[in-house]
């Protein structure tokens, strides 16, 4: 049996596409409204909160969820764990969508979006800006991911010569793909260092924020591979390739990274004499313990062999790790930020609908492309299974 990726086939306009389609339309209409009538027409952003849910969720959390391709690139190509190679293309596709939509969120969040091209014009570079590094590095990485994913398109179109030429330089492209997120994911942690005391002490750490951001990127990257793979398997009604053994192996890496993060998190609080704030009994201490417990759950569960080999517990553990890291990113960038001056922020329903629409776009585009392009490993060779999968 061939292990080469194959198009899933089946109907393009499936039930999930029909369900999420209206959300995409609403999202697009609201984006047009924002671009034409300004930020105030759809958002609650103000002078104290220059960025909100579009940055905290769509960018910081969204690109964290999109780190699956990057995390697997390190596992497969840097640490030579070739057994994970079947997981690379699905993860890379999700990463490409996640980062692209994260870039779009920046575009709609910036007040004078027509000035964005100045980021890339020599003479206008602000090389001391973390925002500059993040924006330019992300843009380059999106292009790198497009090149990494191009072989799937070339194979589908039968462009053998182009595929051969691309494969000759793929080693360099992969090296860039492994390097670039290491830079901008750590920089995303540096974004709030300049906010100083305006970020609650439980999350403000001038030395550790970049490292915490990088660690959560790796944790989210490996966890999303298990999460998305489990959903695909459920969507194919159990007829997809059996990748559970690979997921179980990934849990070892996730457990180590979670342990490192938690130890460093508490170590920093103890060293800076801030641990008492975690027991203050206020809103921020509750958010802190929610974050910690969400990360402790998979750390405990994944240490028990029986639970680790259970598909449902694998899924729940990956989901818990994702939510824990997402909570940390949301809190340090938005919830724990207090600019003073009486400023307050809460996302409007239009802001939330745009963010929900981004998720809907990614889901629908992912479903469409796995049906058209060789992304997933072959299904189990059974006519009934193929029929069931095509209806998914």
From Swiss-Prot:
It is a multi-pass membrane protein. Residues 1-11, 56-58, 112-133, 190-207, 271-281, 355 are periplasmic. The chain crosses the membrane at residues 12-32, 35-55, 59-79, 91-111, 134-154, 169-189, 208-228, 250-270, 282-302, 334-354, 356-376. Residues 33-34, 80-90, 155-168, 229-249, 303-333, 377-392 are cytoplasmic. Keywords: Cell inner membrane, Cell membrane, Electron transport, Heme, Iron, Membrane, Metal-binding, Transmembrane, Transmembrane helix, Transport. GO terms for molecular function: metal ion binding. It comes from the Bacteria. PANTHER family: FORMATE DEHYDROGENASE, NITRATE-INDUCIBLE, CYTOCHROME B556 FDN SUBUNIT (PTHR30074), NI_FE-HYDROGENASE 2 B-TYPE CYTOCHROME SUBUNIT-RELATED (PTHR30074:SF4). Probable b-type cytochrome. This is Probable Ni/Fe-hydrogenase 2 b-type cytochrome subunit. The lineage of its organism: Bacteria, Pseudomonadati, Pseudomonadota, Gammaproteobacteria, Enterobacterales. The gene is hybB.
